[in-house]
Structure formats: C-alpha cells, structure tokens
C-alpha cells in the first residue's frame, strides 16, 4: 500500500472519530454563530510584477522524518517579519507532525492569511478549518471524487 493510501485510510478514521465527538450539524451551527477574523487569501497573492510567497510550516515528513527543530512560535514570528504573503500550516498529525490547533497559534502571531494544508476528505474538515482559524484550505483533487468537489 502506498503512503497516500495509508494517509487517506488514517484520515478517514480520524474524521469518523471527530464526528463522534462533535457532530457535523453542531460544527455547522458553530460556524454560523462564530465571529472571527477572516483574512483574504486570494488578495494576498495578487501582487503584480513580483513573485508571491507562501511560507510553510511542515514539522516532519513520512519519508524524511523530523524537518524542523525550531519552535512553532519562532517560525511564525520569522514568517511574519519576512513579509511572506501567506502561511501554509500542515495539520496532519500522524504523518506530518502537525496539529489543527497550530492554525490559531500561527494566526495569533502572524498577520498573513493562513492556509490549512492537510488531507481534506470530508466537509467536516472544511468547517473545522474555519473554526480553527484557517483562511483557506488545500484540496488534493486526486483524493476526492467529483461529487465531493461540488
């Protein structure tokens, strides 16, 4: 079994467990009643005549192991000062050492829009991403069927 298949199987188990803790309906209601700072991701990447930069926080890789030793807060501060246009935060825990809680941690430090980089397979994760502070999410089309994309 390839790594992408392993990740997908694990992620589906995680989502099932999350749904038992907080239902999708409850999550949707929380989104509707929440008030939060949403930063314009697309607008941040529309500079003309220069390269746009999305800086990434990726703690580890399933093939390379641990990638960073610097604390998350220090990395977020560095990206804030570097004038990156947006910050991508890997949130998959098992394979990439991330945590969905890191979205809000980075958002409290940096002014840039925050992209949640994970294996988004279910609408549940979209609502969760919003509530945890993401301004955008990354979708891997090869993991989703046409119905899921609509």
Go through each PLM region and give its residues:
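Conserved anion-binding
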Residues: 109-150
């Amino acid at each position: 079994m390839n790594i992408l298949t392993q990740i997908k199987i694990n992620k589906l188990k995680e989502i099932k467990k999350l749904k038992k803790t907080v239902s999708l309906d409850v999550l949707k209601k929380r989104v509707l009643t929440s008030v939060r700072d949403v930063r314009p991701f697309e607008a941040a990447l529309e500079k003309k005549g220069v390269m746009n930069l999305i800086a990434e926080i990726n703690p580890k890789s399933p093939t390379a192991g641990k990638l960073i030793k610097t604390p998350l807060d220090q990395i977020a501060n560095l990206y804030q000062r570097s004038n990156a246009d947006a910050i991508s935060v890997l949130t998959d825990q098992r394979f990439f050492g991330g945590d969905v809680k890191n979205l809000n941690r980075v958002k409290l430090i940096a002014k840039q829009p925050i992209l949640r980089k994970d294996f988004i397979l279910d609408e549940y994760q979209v609502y969760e991403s919003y509530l945890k502070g993401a301004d955008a999410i990354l979708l891997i089309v090869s993991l989703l069927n046409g119905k899921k994309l609509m």
